[in-house]
């Protein structure tokens, strides 16, 4: 009941968003292991379920998003809900610019390093979503991300909206609060107060080639967390 209400409210918010211009999102960061591909694939599926034309670009040399899409096709059939392509280096900027008129949303999954692919993606992106695990080694990289954002904004004519959030958050303990405090203090980056918990549902869904919102029976807590995260970003993107 609660989950259905959340999904309906989310759908309403998304339908309220003006789709006259293609929205481009880069899911990235400086450190690997923060769950970027999980976020990217779930965002692509989440948007596609709202009826949007979505392009998922795998700009990570590990090609995990490409592997997921291939596995998804085997499990759910030819119609996976979005278009998936692989691009690296400057081709990310060049090809996405050529393709953007064909899609309402483009989601770019980049690796956990400061690469040419990630910078090429950021130059053409409207939004930069950066997940952080609430661990010291992960949080320490936020200042490198901040520097990267500053460099991109210095050469980018259009605004780059940056959202940071906690992924794989602990169910309890001080680590979440301490990490959130650091992220909130970073100028030029918006902290999203909707963490994703460290839940088995994400790997369970990926193993079936599904997004969290497609699990049946659903994982209510994971679905609500994901919807809260994306809804927060979308509702603020219209401001």
Where would I find each of the regions flagged by the language model?
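Inter-motif core of Ras-like GTPase G domains
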Residues: 117-136
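Inter-lobe coupling/hinge region of RecA-like P-loop helicase motors
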Residues: 203-227
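Beta-strand-loop-alpha "switch" segments that mediate conformational coupling across diverse proteins
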Residues: 170, 180-212
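P-loop/Walker-type NTP enzyme "switch/lid" segment
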Residues: 24, 28-30, 34, 45-116, ...
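Extreme N-terminal, non-catalytic leader segments
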Residues: 1-26
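Hydrophobic positions on the alpha1 helix immediately C-terminal to the Walker A/P-loop
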Residues: 39
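Conserved C-terminal guanine-recognition region of P-loop GTPase G domains, centered on the G4
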Residues: 143-156
